[in-house]
UniProtKB/Swiss-Prot annotation:
Protein name: Xaa-Pro dipeptidyl-peptidase
Gene behind this protein: pepX
Catalytic reactions of this protein: Hydrolyzes Xaa-Pro-|- bonds to release unblocked, N-terminal dipeptides from substrates including Ala-Pro-|-p-nitroanilide and (sequentially) Tyr-Pro-|-Phe-Pro-|-Gly-Pro-|-Ile
Family: Belongs to the peptidase S15 family.
GO cellular component, one term: cytoplasm
UniProt entry keywords in alphabetical sequence: Aminopeptidase, Cytoplasm, Hydrolase, Protease, Serine protease
Gene3D superfamilies reported for this sequence: 1.10.246.70, alpha/beta hydrolase, Galactose-binding domain-like
Cellular location(s): Cytoplasm
Organism name: Streptococcus uberis (strain ATCC BAA-854 / 0140J)
Subunit structure: Homodimer.
A single MF term (Gene Ontology): dipeptidyl-peptidase activity
Entry-linked Pfam families: Peptidase_S15, PepX_C, PepX_N
Length: 758
């Protein structure tokens, strides 16, 4: 374990003592450090009446148990304080470490010892993570140090888990959204599932907008998958025109109806553990799936602002600007009189994407979004540079396939019977609008691009994203982060994992950072907590995070690609083509081992390089036919230890999100030996070489010169590392699989790689 502590708010001794006493710690009148520490430990071991036994089970140093130390005439030193602190945090002397000084340095132990201000040291210790991934104070609360009294208790600017999760209110309401997404002449009602603790005060909300949460239709999804075995189209040269457009909203009727309590409850929901963490700390949890999902009205419009409006309506209801009904009969209203109107949104992938969209509406009441692995432009999710480009691991998926998956109204046979004809009519329109024939940008995709509306964001923004995420690729967060106005407080956690959550990792106090932030923004707690702009996981060292100011730089380092000319063939034998088409992973294995149709260029580095942003390939090439595509990957090549892209379990169910509530595993990205690591990649249609809004002709055997931007990255390379560039045509994981006979010819002398260098 290595500490990367960003959530602790520096606290002086006087404030620290007051906070400790408010929790129930008792201290002697004496200001002697040793007596203060003993009093702290007496309270810490609250579950046992035999304090001496508990204290004697610790050691003060490798020759003295802790009880003997307290009985002896020896002062409390930094070494003894550190030794005891480590044991409280779950480290075992003699097994986890043998040399105290070396170990505290190795793990970057963050707690300072100050014998003249021991209250500050103890306070910091309680605000430090246990080996099990929980703050020491949270570990104490988990064991019952403070009972669940449904009252806010704060420590170091964070709310504690003192809300009773065994007596939660679980209710369902139907919020009226000012849209008619299926054109049935009625405003759409949206099902909202609410979990909230009992409280005498109005409380804030953590909302997850998840089109998956009411169920998914995998059978319909699989039937809708598109074949990737198709020719690359030859497109006529033309310019593409799009316009920013706003959706039409309805004026909802203000009917004279009674106001009542909700009349529908539920027993279980597949919750998100970060939400559970906040639920036990006094935040309501809301799960909503939006239009076109089970028990809601409308059509699944998939990614546009009509869908976003169905989630925005929930925030409006929480602030008294929209109506909610007890049922689809629309006979009685329900008020959110328990809500203080302040909302944060959470969730990964599609869920985080809805957070992005919501933020760009500027809706009042949305204070923070925590958008993890989120899409900012749906075109960049299903297309790239004029090409069909399936998200990593899902060849054949497209937006209409996602519609089939998430239109969970189809899971209710009676509802689907009534909606089927209209649904397929709208779905067919969607399938035409996505234009798989050309792969080009169009108005449909522009309506699902949140970047032009980033200027409207007013809430605080938190992103997390994996630099090995080839599902929702890094460009999604890169573009959104850099598009936000300067007035917006924004933060980005960049890790080296794939499409994964990171809130339960040992190396970073993510949950605690979010706790401090939401206390500021949703509960109005004044604190000095400041989250850095960017927290980046260093790829060269295990469990090391560091703060940065920007993602992307204008500084560049140019690497010429070589001398002479090189050819890349597109066509494979029928046997090889079929094998790659059936299993794209076999293609990737052959590509990385030099067995595919490819050009491989290696560049040993004679200096350290810190990549930060978009690598650009400047290419001079010809195609033997009047079309073509090019794919590229940038690799850190060579056998060495690197961070894996999937977190492994360090310990099972040790992280308690409340008081024995919603336990989850402690995880971390492992450092393992590998032969290569993909730093970046990209694909491009030669007819779209100068941007998305222009389709150009390609003349056979005529030279083209263009810049090819790869996915952005933040990656550290060291002197002696080998940077590898792979150039090829068809990518069997992402692009259409065209096995026609053509080749690309590259002028290496006129081509180069431009690296963004911090």
């Amino acid at each position: 374990m290595r500490y990367n502590q960003f959530s602790y708010i520096k606290t002086d001794g006087q404030v620290a003592k007051k906070e400790l006493e408010n929790l129930g710690f008792h201290f002697p009148i004496s200001n002697k450090p040793k007596e203060i520490f003993r009093s702290f430990l007496n309270t810490y071991f609250f579950q046992s009446s035999d304090k001496d036994y508990q204290i004697a089970s610790f050691i003060a140093d490798f020759e003295t148990d802790l009880l003997s130390f307290f009985n002896a005439d020896k002062p409390l030193t930094k070494e003894i304080f550190d030794m005891v602190s480590l044991q409280l945090l779950g480290f075992i002397p003699g097994f986890d470490f043998e040399n105290l000084k070396e170990f505290t340095s190795q793990i970057a132990f963050p707690v300072p010892f100050n014998e003249n201000d021991l209250f500050a040291s103890i306070h910091h210790l309680l605000g430090t993570r246990h080996k099990n991934g929980m703050l020491l104070i949270d570990d104490l609360i988990s064991k019952g140090f403070l009972g669940p009294d449904n009252t806010y208790h704060f420590f170091n600017g964070k709310t504690l888990a003192t809300f009773d999760t065994s007596q939660l209110i679980k209710e369902v309401v139907y919020v009226e959204a000012p849209i008619d997404s299926d054109n049935d002449g009625k405003s759409d009602l949206i099902k909202v599932m609410i979990l909230r603790p009992r409280s005498q005060k109005q409380i804030p909300t953590v909302m997850t907008a998840s089109p998956y949460h009411q169920g998914i239709n995998e059978v319909a999804n699989d039937k809708k998958l598109h074949s990737m075995q198709t020719d690359l189209p030859l497109k006529e040269a033309h310019k593409i025109h799009v316009a920013d457009a706003s959706i039409s909203t309805l004026v909802c009727e203000n009917a004279d109806l009674p106001i009542t309590e909700n009349t529908e409850q539920f027993s279980y929901i597949d919750s998100y553990t970060l939400n559970d963490y906040f639920l036990s700390r006094g935040f309501a949890n809301i799960y909503v799936s939006g239009v076109g999902t089970a028990d809601s009205d409308g059509f699944m419009t998939s990614g546009d602002y009509v869908q976003i409006e169905s989630f925005k309506a929930i925030i409006d209801w929480l602030n008294g600007r929209a109506k909610a009904f007890t049922s689809h009969k629309r006979e009685a209203y329900v008020l959110a009189n328990w809500s203080n109107g302040k909302v944060a949104t959470t969730g990964k992938s599609y869920l985080g994407t809805m957070s992005n969209g919501l933020a760009t509406t500027g809706v009042e009441g949305l204070e923070v979004i925590i958008a993890e692995a989120a899409i900012s432009s749906w075109y960049d999710y299903y297309r790239e540079n004029g090409l069909i480009c399936s998200p990593g691991g899902y060849p054949g998926e497209d937006l209409d396939v996602l519609t089939e998956l998430t239109y969970s109204r189809s899971l209710h046979a009676g509802d689907f019977l009534r909606q089927k004809e209209k649904y397929y009519q709208l779905l067919n329109q969607q399938s035409q609008a996505i234009d798989r024939d050309s792969g080009d940008y169009n108005q449909f995709w522009h309506d699902r691009n949140y970047l032009p509306n980033a200027k409207n964001v007013t809430c605080e923004v938190v992103f997390t994203h994996g630099l090995q995420d080839w599902n929702v690729k890094p460009r999604q967060v890169y573009n959104m982060f850099n598009a936000l106005p300067g007035s917006v407080a924004k933060h980005l956690f960049l890790h080296h994992g794939q499409h994964v959550y990171m809130h339960n990792w040992q190396s970073i106090d993510f949950k605690e950072c979010m706790n401090a932030l939401l206390c500021q923004k949703l509960l109005g707690i004044a604190s000095n907590f400041q989250l850095p702009a960017i927290l980046w996981q260093n790829n060269q060292e295990e469990q090391k995070w560091q703060s940065l100011e920007e993602f992307g730089t204008s500084n560049t380092f140019r690497i010429p690609l070589g001398e002479g000319f090189a050819k890349i063939s597109n066509q494979y034998s029928t046997e090889t083509f079929e094998r790659y088409s059936k299993d794209f992973k076999s293609f990737k294995r052959d590509l990385f081992s030099g067995k595919a149709n490819q050009l491989s260029l290696e560049f040993p580095l004679d200096q350290d390089l810190q990549l930060n942003g978009e690598a650009i390939l400047h290419l001079s090439l010809t195609s033997s036919v009047s079309k073509g595509l090019i794919s590229a990957q940038l690799l850190d090549k060579g056998l060495k230890k690197r961070l894996g892209d999937t977190p492994t379990i360090l310990d099972l169910k040790v992280m308690d999100n409340g008081q024995n509530f919603s336990r989850e595993d402690l995880k971390e990205l492992p450092m393992r030996e590998s032969t290569e690591r993909v730093i970046s990649k990209g694909v491009l249609n030669l007819q779209n070489r100068d941007g998305l809004l222009e389709v150009q002709s390609v003349e056979a055997d005529q030279w083209l010169s263009f810049d090819f931007k790869l996915q952005p990255s933040l990656y550290q390379l060291r002197k002696g590392d080998c940077l590898q560039v792979l150039l090829y045509t068809t990518d069997f994981e992402h692009t259409v699989r065209d096995n026609s006979d053509y080749e690309l010819r590259i002028n290496l002398e006129k081509s180069y790689l431009s690296l963004p260098i911090a």
